[in-house]
């Protein structure tokens, strides 16, 4: 959940980054998250995976595919836009990119798993919870992140994490996914 952290600005030069995860490590992390989701949710038919654009949507697609392969269940997915639910909308220099939210309704009596690429301050996750509440009141909300880099500003914790990666606040984590970025799957650490 890197939006708090210059996610949508120009990328630093690739030469200054350190690769943290390659495509195979990302695949293994997502497979592990898949098994944890299956173990923690007895009724997978009541689960909705809700990806935060952009990379959270692609990660959601991959998780749903893995769940289908492992549990033989077609899990419902959706997209949850957080742009207008963020607590920093009025203080940002640029307007946030707005994407359409699309969730399978109703959400009542269901478990919604918010999916994002990076969990940082927790503000994007909080905004996602606010956005979900505008669609209904799920029985439970869980959080999945490919990378948890720490530095929470809110009392939010991921239920499912691919990789815990302690960082300095001035460092930046970038997740690159082939279907989104037209670059090989990788997680990069950039020092400023």
Regions found by a protein language model. Give the residues of each.
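PRPP-associated nucleotide enzymes
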Residues: 1-192
């Amino acid at each position: 959940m890197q939006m708090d952290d210059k996610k949508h600005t120009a990328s630093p030069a690739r030469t200054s980054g350190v690769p943290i995860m390659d495509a195979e490590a990302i695949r293994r992390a997502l497979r592990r998250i898949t098994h944890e989701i299956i173990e923690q949710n007895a009724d997978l038919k009541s689960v909705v995976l809700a990806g935060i654009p952009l990379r959270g949507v692609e990660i959601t697609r991959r998780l749903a595919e893995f769940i289908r392969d492992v549990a033989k269940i077609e899990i419902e997915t959706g997209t949850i836009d957080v742009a207008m639910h963020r607590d920093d909308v009025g203080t940002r220099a640029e307007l946030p990119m707005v994407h359409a939210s699309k969730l399978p309704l109703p959400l009542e009596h269901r478990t919604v798993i918010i999916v994002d690429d990076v969990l940082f301050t927790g503000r994007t996750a909080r905004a996602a919870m606010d956005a979900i509440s505008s669609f209904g009141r799920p029985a439970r909300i869980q959080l999945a992140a490919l990378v948890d880099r720490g530095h929470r500003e809110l009392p939010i914790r991921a239920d499912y994490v691919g990789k815990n990666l302690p960082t300095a606040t001035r460092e930046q984590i970038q997740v690159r996914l082939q279907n989104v970025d037209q670059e090989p799957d990788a997680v990069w650490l950039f020092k400023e």
